[in-house]
Amino acid sequence: MKQEETTPEQRPPARLPLWANPRIGLVVLLIALIALFTTLRPAFLNTQLTLVPMQADISVYAVVGLSQLAVLSLGHMNMAVGRMAAMSAFASGLLHDRLDAPLLVALAGGLAVGALLGALAGLVISRTGVNSFVVTLALDFALIGLVSLLYATFTDGVAFNGLPAGMSALRTDTFADYCAGDVCGPEIPLLAPIALIAVLGVGLLFRWSRVGREVLMTGANAKAAELSGIPVRWRVVQAHALSGLLAGLAGFLLSANNGSFSAGVGDGFLLPSFLAPVLGGTLLVGGAVSVLGTVLGTAITQVIYKGLNLLQFQVDELKLYIGLVLLAALSLDRLRHVLAERRGVPA
């Protein structure tokens, strides 16, 4: 009996081995860093000193990373992510200070301002064809002056004094503070579920929704997407609006974590906004994103920062070593991709 031959076209594609899976690599790196810092400083696992504050920071900066991820999906950049957060925080603070708005109304107002700023940037980019880097950088400079002017006009200094009812609890409380009889919740800050909702929402958007898929197709090849009937300009506006909305949410979370709506909200957002998604596997050229990878990238960044801080590194040293460690991580990730390609498996 003649034996059937299997041609290359008939063979199933090579499966990605565990060692070449980028998410597995990030999890292994995260576990290794936690083990290292715990060995060097056992206080790293102290709940109140390290774990709860670190969870709050991860919650804030995961949303910051998602804000940048929204436009990286197009191959664009949002250089104004920090200033959009500051403007959103100002709007929330103003609504409470002048109109005595409750927490949810103040939050909604801030998110609306962030989304409008993002949509404005997206509209300019889609209509003029000017590079997103240039447009959002110009917007960033404009908002720097506007934020300072607005805070100087509407506050006594650089921050609103009061907070909406319930916002202080977001800063100080964990689920362990709420009990049903003798059963109390875990030591997880109240900020975490808000960030989790954002993570799930963005993940579902890009995974299952038509809009998310069309944004990714636009990022992969805008001309081909337009020829296939996708409203490319509208998708650009929507992606930038989402970026602004998430920046606004991050500004609100940081304000809650800091205990005030201040002009300095968002000052340190730009670098982390790129580090988390890129470390997590999101492509700078567009067309592919990783929401889970962004969360893992954020966790790795914050673990490094907290660990080095416990080891009493100075601020400049912290920046240096965080940069070196992340550069090494990105280089190893690239090496893994090259090795995977040589073995004939998709990276």
Task: Give, region by region, the residue ranges found by the protein language model.
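Single transmembrane alpha-helix segments in multi-pass membrane proteins
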Residues: 34-40, 47-99, 123-130, 277-292, ...
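Alpha-helical transmembrane segments within multi-pass membrane transporters and channels
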Residues: 100-141, 297-300
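Membrane-helix/interface signature in polytopic inner-membrane proteins
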Residues: 50, 200-241
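Transmembrane helix-bundle core of multi-pass membrane transporters
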Residues: 132-208, 235-238, 258-266, 342-347
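Transmembrane alpha-helical segments in multi-pass inner-membrane proteins
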Residues: 247, 257-322
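Structural signal for alpha-helical transmembrane segments and their membrane-water exit/capping regions
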Residues: 32-46, 74, 150-151, 202-210, ...
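Cytosolic-side transmembrane-helix boundaries in multi-pass membrane proteins
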Residues: 1-35, 39, 220, 227-234, ...
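Inter-helical junctions in multi-pass inner-membrane proteins, predominant
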Residues: 42-53, 152-155, 206-212, 240-277, ...
